[in-house]
From Swiss-Prot:
InterPro entries referenced in this protein's UniProt entry, alphabetically: Domain_X, Maturase_MatK, Maturase_MatK_N
Family the entry assigns: Belongs to the intron maturase 2 family. MatK subfamily.
Cellular localization per UniProt: Plastid, Chloroplast
Keyword Ubl conjugation: no
GO annotation, cellular component aspect: chloroplast
Chain's role: Usually encoded in the trnK tRNA gene intron. Probably assists in splicing its own and other chloroplast group II introns.
Organism, as annotated: Styphnolobium japonicum
Taxonomy of the source species: Eukaryota, Viridiplantae, Streptophyta, Embryophyta, Tracheophyta
Sorted UniProt keywords: Chloroplast, mRNA processing, Plastid, RNA-binding, tRNA processing
Name of the featured protein: Maturase K
GO MF, one annotated term: RNA binding
GO BP field: mRNA processing; RNA splicing; tRNA processing
Pfam families given in the database record: Intron_maturas2 (PF01348), MatK_N (PF01824)
Length: 506
């Protein structure tokens, strides 16, 4: 355990002292409101009123200096006509601006970490969520077992605050942090209901994402710390995450738990064939070794959540499956490893033999049933997959209707071009194509048959099927065989940085 303590002492100087004058500068909140939030590609528009401006933010900061408390009551905002149109606007702007301020030191450390690892140039490509699938193709064909792990949400938002306690030593910082959360949570209750966390995350998107991401980074840093168990612990993307005040005692407790339950030490978990992949709150743990080791990792994660984060998780929520027999769902794809058998004729003198050679291949399949369920929820079809019209768009122009349908179809086609089998993708395109025709027919108060007959042709809808072929024909203008092979094969794009709403059907 001495090597852990020595390592943790190396980064003791990284503990943060936040500059509170910076937190109470009005231009920070103006920046958070005017630019960083509404134009962010990572955080969607949180719905601020268009009437608000930098002047409102300045008046709010002035009012904060004159108040004895930071959070103004809802009754006060209702009485004041200036704030009456949106009683949560003031706390929302402050909390989001506060998130911008506290992100600054951590983003600087992350940038320095990337520079040390010399991966800054390729950082943009690493942002693509599709970059994980080539890794699956290269590595998972050699693995045997996979486990779906969903990182549990903390039952109380105070746990998210406590994770920052290992980094920040200023008490006023946490008082300010709790004031933002107090408006949405009942702190008299020992357990915060899920609806409070949901409400808080929707109204304070960036603030909640900062707390939750820090909670996940805390979990992953401990996971990787114990996984490596060596003196060389400065992993490329996680070197900024190892400063902990009470970490040494937690490690000792985990060692005692495993020594008691499994009669082994932590060195048992040094598995060179373990692979860990995460996106948002879902992670994949895969290994080549026996299922006994995977079970050890399973109970290790449960104990980690229970003793370090005080989050209860049932063992039955983590399933361990064999890759050759079960599929795992990740990033909108169903993936599994199947064996392709190929016959090879071998001849020796006058005798000939036929030998079957099995090669493992990763299959990525479009989950047609969940995707149809998402289309039905968005009113493009019914639960059986039969296309229906979109009444909300029937009052728009023809160009707007066609453009919206084409955009959705292109996005789905772009995302699912890595599928091993394109039949399900064609079915989704057909649903959207027919839904577009029915919406246009509804707008013109006609039947589908009469609308198409009056139109005389449906060539203007052929883009639903020919877009990929046209793109690939520009790349390979003289190689028709190469074009057909690529169109039928898998294509991964490095410009996809988030999941489409229809794809994210969980």
């Amino acid at each position: 355990m001495e090597e852990y303590q020595v390592y943790l002492e190396l980064d003791r100087s990284r503990q943060q002292d936040f500059l509170y004058p910076l937190i109470f500068r009005e231009y920070i909140y103006g920046l958070a409101y005017g630019h960083d939030l509404n134009r962010s590609i990572l955080v969607e528009n949180v719905g601020y009123d268009n009437k608000s401006s930098l002047l409102i933010v300045k008046r709010l900061i002035t009012r904060m200096y004159q108040q004895n408390h930071l959070i103004i009551s809802a009754n006060d905002s209702n009485k004041n006509p200036f704030w009456g149109y949106n009683k949560n606007l003031y706390s929302q702007i402050i909390s989001e601006g506060f998130a911008v301020v506290v992100e600054i030191p951590f983003s600087l450390q992350l940038s320095s970490s990337l520079e040390e690892a010399e991966i800054v140039k390729s950082y943009k490509n690493l942002r693509s969520i599709h970059s994980i699938f080539p890794f699956f193709e290269d590595q998972f064909t050699y693995l045997n077992y996979v486990s779906d792990v969903r990182i549990p949400y903390p039952i109380h938002l105070e746990i998210l605050v406590q994770t920052l306690r290992y980094w920040v030593k200023d008490a006023p910082f946490f008082h300010l942090l709790r004031l933002f959360i107090y408006e949405y949570c009942n702190w008299n209750s020992l357990i915060t209901p899920k609806k409070y966390i949901s409400t808080f995350s929707k109204r304070n998107t960036r603030f909640f994402l900062f707390l939750y991401n820090f909670y996940v980074c805390e979990y992953e840093s401990i996971l990787l710390f114990l996984r490596n168990k060596s003196a060389h612990l400065r992993l490329t993307s996680f070197s900024v995450l190892f400063e902990r005040i009470y970490f040494y005692a937690k490690i000792e407790h985990l060692v005692e738990v495993f020594a008691k339950d499994f009669s082994s030490t932590l060195s048992f978990f040094k598995d060179p064939f373990i692979h860990y992949v995460r996106y948002q709150g879902k992670s994949i743990l895969a290994s080549k070794n026996a299922p006994l080791l995977m079970n050890k990792w399973k109970y290790y994660l449960i104990h980690l959540w229970q003793y370090h984060f005080y989050v209860w998780s049932q063992p039955g929520t983590i399933h361990i499956n064999q890759l050759s027999e079960h599929s795992f769902h990740f990033l909108g794809y169903f993936s599994n490893v199947r064996i392709n058998l190929s016959a090879v004729r071998s001849q020796m003198l006058e005798n000939s033999f036929i030998i079957e050679i099995g090669m493992k291949k990763l299959d990525t399949i479009v989950p047609i049933i969940p995707l149809i369920r998402s289309l039905a929820k968005a009113k493009f079809c019914n639960v059986l997959g039969h296309p229906i019209s979109k009444p909300v768009w029937a009052y728009s122009s023809d160009f707007y209707i066609i453009d919206r349908f084409l955009r959705i179809c292109r996005n789905l086609s772009h995302y699912y071009n890595g599928s091993s089998k394109k039949k399900s993708l064609y079915q989704i395109k057909y649903i959207l194509r027919l839904s577009c025709i029915k919406t246009l027919a509804r707008k013109h108060k006609s039947t589908v048959r009469a609308f198409l007959k009056r139109l005389g042709s449906e060539e203007f809808l052929e883009e639903f099927f020919t877009e990929e072929e046209e793109i690939l024909s520009l790349i390979f203008p003289r190689a028709s065989s190469t074009l057909q092979r690529l169109y039928r094969g898998r294509i991964w794009y490095l410009d996809i940085i988030f999941i489409n709403d229809l794809v994210n059907h969980e």
